[in-house]
């Protein structure tokens, strides 16, 4: 019970901090974040969208959001890749800069458990 309360307080504090940071960090229209299958797999429509953008839209920077499990595969297939490990502090700050976010399941499952979506499309 105490562990659950601690986790809830931690998650709420993180969300509030990210919300406050979102007012100071400007979204960049050339940044695109893509996630799929909770970050566990580099598959599905998100994969093809990411590869298409990297190949055909050199003006955009693609960030793939995933777990450590998918990092190696993303490095091999997505060039130039920018991998963000889901729910890490550095990933959430980088996500605050992304103007566009694409996901296959739900935003809080594929991209981040924290609220990094204010003013994102």
PLM region descriptions:
Residues 1-38:
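Membrane-proximal basic amphipathic "stem/tether" segments
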């Amino acid at each position: 019970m105490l562990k659950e309360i601690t986790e809830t307080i931690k998650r709420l504090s993180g969300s509030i901090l990210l919300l406050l940071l979102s007012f100071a960090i400007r979204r960049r229209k050339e940044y695109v974040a893509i996630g799929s299958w909770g970050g566990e797999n580099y598959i599905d429509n998100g994969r093809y969208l990411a590869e298409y953008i990297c190949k055909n839209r050199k003006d955009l920077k693609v960030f793939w959001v995933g777990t450590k499990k998918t990092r190696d595969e993303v490095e091999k297939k997505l060039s130039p890749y920018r991998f963000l490990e889901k729910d890490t502090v550095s990933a959430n700050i980088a996500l605050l800069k992304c103007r566009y976010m694409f996901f296959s399941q739900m935003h809080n499952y594929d991209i981040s458990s924290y609220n990094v979506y204010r003013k994102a499309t």
